[in-house]
Amino acid sequence: MPKAKTHSGASKRFRRTGTGKIVRQKANRRHLMEHKPTKRTRRLAGRTQVSANDAPRINKMLNG
């Protein structure tokens, strides 16, 4: 059986931590930021953990 390929879209969007959790960037922070409150843009900064229901599917795409 050939080697499974990593889903390239998933590899760009998700990252696995050292403990095996999958994290992602939050949405709504790419452009058109000037009319969004600073409070909102601060809240959207950083990474957040993927929901438990989505994790197995993403893990499969990342060949985990």
UniProtKB/Swiss-Prot annotation:
InterPro entries referenced in this protein's UniProt entry, alphabetically: Ribosomal_bL35 (IPR001706), Ribosomal_bL35-like (IPR021137), Ribosomal_bL35_CS (IPR018265), Ribosomal_bL35_sf (IPR037229)
Taxonomic superkingdom: Bacteria
CC terms in the record's Gene Ontology section: cytosolic large ribosomal subunit
Keywords annotated in UniProt: Ribonucleoprotein, Ribosomal protein
Disulfide bond sites: none
One term of GO molecular function: structural constituent of ribosome
Pfam family membership, one: Ribosomal_L35p
UniProt-annotated stretches for the region Disordered: 1-20, 37-64
Gene Ontology BP terms: translation
SUPFAM superfamilies, per database record: L35p-like (SSF143034)
PANTHER family: 54S RIBOSOMAL PROTEIN BL35M (PTHR33343), LARGE RIBOSOMAL SUBUNIT PROTEIN BL35M (PTHR33343:SF1)
HAMAP family assigned to the protein according to its UniProt record, in alphabetical order: Ribosomal_bL35
Similarity comment text for this entry: Belongs to the bacterial ribosomal protein bL35 family.
Protein's recorded name: Large ribosomal subunit protein bL35
Organism from which the protein derives: Mycobacterium sp. (strain KMS)
Lineage: Bacteria, Bacillati, Actinomycetota, Actinomycetes, Mycobacteriales
